[in-house]
Amino acid sequence: MRVLITNDDGPLSDQFSPYIRPFIQHIKRNYPEWKITVCVPHVQKSWVGKAHLAGKNLTAQFIYSKVDAEDNTFWGPFIQPQIRSENSKLPYVLNAEIPKDTIEWILIDGTPASCANIGLHLLSNEPFDLVLSGPNVGRNTSAAYITSSGTVGGAMESVITGNTKAIAISWAYFNGLKNVSPLLMEKASKRSLDVIKHLVKNWDPKTDLYSINIPLVESLSDDTKVYYAPIWENRWIPIFNGPHINLENSFAEIEDGNESSSISFNWAPKFGAHKDSIHYMDEYKDRTVLTDAEVIESEMISVTPMKATFKGVNHLLGELKLTEEENNLSKTNNLIVVSIDPMEYIYKPLTHALKKYLPQVEIVSNLPEFDNGGCEKEMKVFHYGDYEQLDMDKLMELPNNYFTNSYIYRKALIRKHFLSHTIQTYTAKNPESILKKAYLESFTIDLDYAEFLDDALDENWELRQELENESQDKWWIVKPSMSDKGQGIRVFKTIEDLQAIFDSFDDEDSEAEESGNDDDADDVNGEFMDNNKVNISQLRHFIIQEYLTNPLLLASMDNRKFHIRCYVVCRGDLQVFVYDRMLALFAAKPFVPLDPYAYSVTDLKDLECHLTNTCLQSKKKDKDSSVLEFDSIEEIPNERKSNIKEQIHSITNDVFLAAVNVNRLNFQPLPNAFETYGVDFLIDSNYEVKLLEINAFPDFKQTGKDLKNLIDELFDDTVKYCVTPIFNENRNKTDDETDPNFVKVIDYTSNGW
């Protein structure tokens, strides 16, 4: 790996830059495969941020130090390199007095950002893989320090003008004691590199650069905890004092640069005088999240993922009209109703986004009484609630006043047997559709009781033929059409297997009725929860689908089968958006190929490795390892991930067009509603995507606590593009370009609204 190292404290120095030599020496000793280039300011350039000295031509000097030096002595400076460096663009002379294994320091009379820029573009014939900026003498935590930091500025320059990954490193000393022992600097170097290695290996795709802070405390060790931490949004006070008046002759002109008698303002920062910004984010005040400043004060290591940008305020876009028009929202009786339980997983992401984009609109928890006659013409009410809480009469009668988060009719997609019929009808008319290969062969049967299975198969002779064809090595999966959370799913091969499955359902129902206990069949060890029993007579509709026997398996995840959960948002009639931050949900156990001689269709232990629904995994086990963000899976190459997402976009496009065109009775998108669906996909060993099912009101809490930010961003985008235009029609004109993770795949009008 080729690494460029810069800083803002300058070259090795007891007074100004005591940390960089031990840090580089540690890299040289422990990572000899790293090809490092050191390019730093020729003197200390702290507090300059990402500045350049515009108009100034910069020059270079070169100094050299021993790899095993115990002090900050060096050879030089020289006006050109004294040793030959691999892939260097610079001319050199061979100086016999300087050993070949010395550390070369390239000193530029500019800023850290200039050093990064020159280093990336003008020093080497080979590109760099990483830029390390630091270690800074002192912490770089909080908005006040980070925005001023030359260390962070050098890293940011690497991203903006070099498109190179960068990490800013800062070593935080305490009680003003910046000179610490060599042993402590060695520990700080090791721990810094531990964090750097992890970040490089697990680089977040949405992150441009990282800022890490290492506490210089005697307790620093391999056990010192590391925390992702947001920047403390603080505010400071003046960092100068004065004016100081020393005017011996107020009429004198400045000569020879002597300004000692002028009015002066002296550098005098008060490092303890900080306070919270008024914009300090609410979620950081609940004390469940420590800021970078709090982490380092707790003598732990902070890691702050950053974008190389001065963050804009996303909800203020477009033309600024200095008229009363922009205040109209606050002069109406517009209302937002959020009737879901405040303890629900999605309540905070939803209300946070609503307050962010629609601060003028009041949020209440109950829908007020109003009707078509009593509703003001300009009044608009957006109601977010469970399906049963929404007023479907108002949704139909007041299309200009009442808006909801759900359509009324969408069985064509969310009921498995309806979905199968929708796709089969559409592909019959459109054989070139991706759905032809992306939806596994499926059949539907209606069954009241297990003993009527033979009659049901007589009515579906194509299915009977498939099941009786012993020459085929197909396996099948049976699912109740109207169940969710994995209830009633079983894998089988023959008609006898299917009969045994339905008989077991009836047996379980009978036993539960006799015992009065629905939990009798649960696994006593809690490893796999048999909460997926069903009552045949209550569900009646079943889908039988070809089982994918060659799923993509990942060695890094113990070869456990997984499916992708993708959130799809439909707006009006009809725009469809795919949220590209997808989840991968893994089965509890490693995948075991199906063996007709070993597999028991009624033994839930055999089923455990085939079902990826985390709802079926024991509450006694930690489920964190079963849910990952899809983009974080390193074993799948990036080009494969991109292709998988492209397939998902195409499948989503076709399945929603299918519903709106061939099954309009059962999918009726409305102009005054939107809806979020959880769409599940499988990937086979050839990286081909298969559509599993579409869920209305998906179980967002499967995402878990660690990936909550994924849901936060989803609701931010949903409110921005689906709710804000309800109250501000101007947003309809400016939303042609959505956020990169919120991809529009359909823009279609089916009813002329």
Swiss-Prot record:
UniProt KW keywords: Cytoplasm, Ligase, Magnesium, Potassium
Keyword Cytoplasm part of the UniProt annotation: yes
A Gene Ontology molecular function term of the record: ATP binding
Protein family: Belongs to the tubulin--tyrosine ligase family.
Gene3D superfamilies: ATP-grasp fold, A domain, ATP-grasp fold, B domain, Survival protein SurE-like phosphatase/nucleotidase
EC number of the protein: 6.3.2.25
Identification of the protein by name: Probable tubulin--tyrosine ligase PBY1
Cofactor: Mg(2+); K(+)
PROSITE patterns: TTL (PS51221)
Subcellular location: Cytoplasm; Cytoplasm, P-body
GO biological process terms, semicolon-separated: protein modification process
Any one Gene Ontology cellular component term annotated for this protein: P-body
More info: Present with 1770 molecules/cell in log phase SD medium.
Reaction(s) the record says it catalyses: C-terminal L-alpha-aminoacyl-L-glutamyl-L-glutamyl-[tubulin] + L-tyrosine + ATP = C-terminal L-alpha-aminoacyl-L-glutamyl-L-glutamyl-L-tyrosyl-[tubulin] + ADP + phosphate + H(+)
Every TTL domain range: 343-734
Keyword Magnesium appears in the UniProt entry: yes
Functional description taken from the UniProt entry: Probable P-body-associated tubulin--tyrosine ligase.
Pfam entry (one): TTL
Source organism per UniProt: Saccharomyces cerevisiae (strain ATCC 204508 / S288c)
Gene: PBY1
Main subcellular localisation: cytoplasm
